Amino acid sequence: MGGVNFLFGLLKAIPCFAFCFSLTAEKIRVASFNLQNYLIMDRVVEGKWMRDYPKPEKEKRALRSILKQVDADVVAFQEIGERPFLNELWMDLNVTKGPVYPHAIWMPAGDAEEVRHLALFSKIPVNSIRMHHDIEFPYFGDRKTPDRGVLEVTFDSNGTKWKLFNLHLKSKWTERKDDPEAKIRREREARAIRDSLRKSNPPEMNSHYLVVGDFNDHRNSAPLRRFLQVNDTVLTSMIPCEDSRGHRWTQHWAKADSYSRFDYILATPPMLKRLVVGSAKIVDGPDSALASDHRMIFADFQF
């Protein structure tokens, strides 16, 4: 009889344990968003050429609406202007009842002439921040570094240490005729960043990290391949984000009316195991078309 009571007690304890475990699990939503020139610049506004003009208010309202809709725990930004522009976005979210982000990070570009910078908002505590400006690569007899650098942020979720690397690779615009669409430079950038990540986060250490941002290239391009695999070693995998119609493009170039997938979330094998199935999305709808020429991407991870 004592054995029966013991077994009954054990069976009662199992669902309790499962329930308690589910309560302690932590789901983190990670997003990446190219804000399309959230800064002062010469631009066309409602059909008129305007000099030294800020991002139009209707575009700002649309992107705030997207941030509120997605309500990510961590969101990486590309194409933000100087620090006051990030402060403006943070304050506008607060006064319009958007998501509250206690942690805001702004990273200046490594190139003094570059006006587009990297940034990050986070609801969860930040363990450490590193701003990489010293990643070098050879380029036509010279030594170069990624113009915008790489922003590295470390978190601890439910006892698991993980990192996010935010980047914005070289665009296809270039004045060099010997490097059409800057393909060589972008590949060299990607290779150098990849090697830096491998050195600080060896694959055999089963590191948890994400590489997110605007890669300015297609999924089968050399820059993307550099991040995915070296010989037989898998470094990261692309998380297949899609919109409500199953489409996967993230950038619309209005001049050519072309649609491309330039924005990605790449996850190491241990991080990929934490992906919540079906959570990887691309935000569509009228606000997306108005806020930026890029669409926000996001995915959930369980810790």
Segments the model singles out, each with a brief description of its role:
Residues 80-169:
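Structured beta-strand-rich core segments of catalytic domains in phosphoester-bond hydrolases
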Residues 30-35, 63-86, 153, 164, ...:
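Active-site beta-strand/loop signature of hydrolases that rely on acidic residues for catalysis
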Residues 23-96, 106-115, 191:
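N-terminal, active-site-proximal structural segment of metallo-dependent hydrolase catalytic domains
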Residues 1-14:
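Bacterial N-terminal signal peptides that target proteins for export
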Residues 13-24:
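Hydrophobic h-region of N-terminal signal peptides that target proteins for export
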Residues 48-54, 71-79, 106-109, 139-141, ...:
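Second-shell loop/turn segments in exported
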Residues 158-165, 169-188:
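Metal-dependent phosphoester/phosphodiester hydrolase catalytic core
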Residues 145, 195-210, 216-303:
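Metal-dependent phosphoester-hydrolase catalytic domains
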